[in-house]
């Protein structure tokens, strides 16, 4: 008999599975790795997670489009493989370049070191370090400064929460996002217009993503100004909250592992950002920014066809793709319950897979380790006393994590 799951019940199920992912998903990986119950699906094994994320024809991100439309308009994070997606993806990839990575690393180190130098024996890893550094570096690179960091963070978090997390369509979350979008759109429109005027006047302008987008030749797929605004809003909303959370939860995990934290600090002191990154990304495997991604089954299809676990997923089903579970699948990951910094990058699904692999993957593979290096390279850190030393949340986002800096 089919089981009807209301949207609000789906939201509750996502939360409860997330709260108990380790206890629930391990037995599912073994005994029932693919779940299909009425309009709901869940995949838990690494091969199946990558199959679903890689099959954008059957498993779509179409559910994000209506919310994006009311916020600003379509942008690549919520587009399936269409001519619009390919055009805008090509335009953004032409201006967000691999050769920019050293510049982003240096900017991150500089901003992070300023924060540590100004601290007096204690710093909040979220509010006083990660959030202002990420905002400064990433919006500086994009060319999209907000009125101030608190406003930019509020805009990004509220928009992200409605578009990507509000599966229960709570009116309060939607209203808050629409209000903030009403502030953010004219702010960016004015900034884009001012930059375009400066370019036309021959004024000196920064070599950032916005300038590059505005200077793209028409025959190379140049985006019009409203499309530029759509995608910049999408990049800001999709970038700042997720990187901040990823950094915060990784630091929380390392603080729970004193031996690994000590070795990560030594790597930072030695200037080995690649090794620092290995500690951070391994910490994220145990405590991820998100435990699953949501996809909608566009056409009835079978996952893991030809295997004993082959399961039909119905058209319209909401499918939770359990990325954290995939990173603990012993069929794909060696010694998954050990904390190891020698893992191949393929073991990680932090940034998704397939068509909608995180657009910022290459940047974040150096930006997050640089952020960690700036925090860890100096005084030894430990939890601040009391409640301040534990990771705190404001809704879905980390809001505080105090650490003491040794003399």
Feature map (PLM): residue ranges:
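Cytochrome P450
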Residues: 1-407
């Amino acid at each position: 008999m089919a089981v009807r799951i209301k949207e609000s019940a789906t939201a509750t199920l996502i939360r409860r599975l997330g709260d108990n992912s380790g206890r629930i998903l391990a037995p599912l990986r073994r005994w029932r790795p693919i779940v299909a119950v009425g309009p709901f699906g869940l995949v838990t094994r690494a091969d199946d997670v990558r199959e679903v994320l890689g099959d954008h024809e059957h498993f779509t991100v179409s559910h994000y489009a209506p919310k994006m439309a009311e916020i600003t308009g379509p942008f690549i994070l919520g587009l399936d493989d269409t001519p619009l997606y390919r055009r805008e993806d090509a335009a953004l990839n032409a201006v967000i370049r691999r050769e920019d990575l050293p510049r982003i690393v240096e900017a991150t180190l500089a901003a992070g070191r300023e924060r540590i130098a100004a601290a007096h024996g204690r710093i909040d890893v979220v509010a006083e370090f990660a959030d202002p550094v990420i905002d400064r570096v990433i919006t500086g690179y994009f060319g999209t400064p907000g009125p101030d960091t608190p406003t930019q963070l509020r805009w990004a978090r509220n928009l992200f929460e409605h578009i990507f997390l509000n599966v229960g369509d709570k009116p309060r979350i939607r209203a808050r996002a629409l209000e903030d979008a009403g502030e953010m759109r004219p702010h960016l429109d004015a900034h884009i217009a001012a930059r375009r005027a400066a370019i036309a006047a021959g004024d000196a302008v920064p070599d950032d993503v916005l300038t590059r987008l505005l200077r793209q030749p028409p025959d190379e797929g140049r985006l019009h100004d409203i499309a530029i605004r759509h995608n910049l809003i999408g990049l800001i909303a999709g970038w700042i909250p997720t990187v901040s959370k990823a950094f915060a939860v990784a630091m929380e995990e390392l603080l729970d592992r004193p031996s690994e934290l000590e070795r990560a600090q030594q790597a930072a002191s030695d200037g080995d950002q690649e090794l620092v990154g290995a500690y951070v990304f391994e910490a994220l495997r145990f405590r991820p920014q998100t435990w699953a991604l949501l996809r909608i089954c566009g056409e009835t299809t079978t996952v893991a066809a030809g295997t004993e676990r082959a399961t039909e997923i119905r058209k319209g089903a909401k499918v939770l793709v359990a990325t954290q579970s995939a990173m603990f699948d012993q069929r794909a990951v060696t010694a998954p319950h050990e904390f190891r910094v020698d893992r191949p990058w393929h073991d990680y699904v932090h940034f998704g897979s397939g068509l909608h692999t995180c657009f910022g993957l290459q940047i974040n593979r150096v930006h997050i380790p640089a952020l960690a290096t700036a925090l860890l390279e100096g005084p030894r850190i430990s939890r601040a006393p009391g409640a301040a030393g534990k990771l705190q949340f404001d809704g879905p986002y980390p809001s505080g994590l105090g650490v003491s800096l040794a003399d």
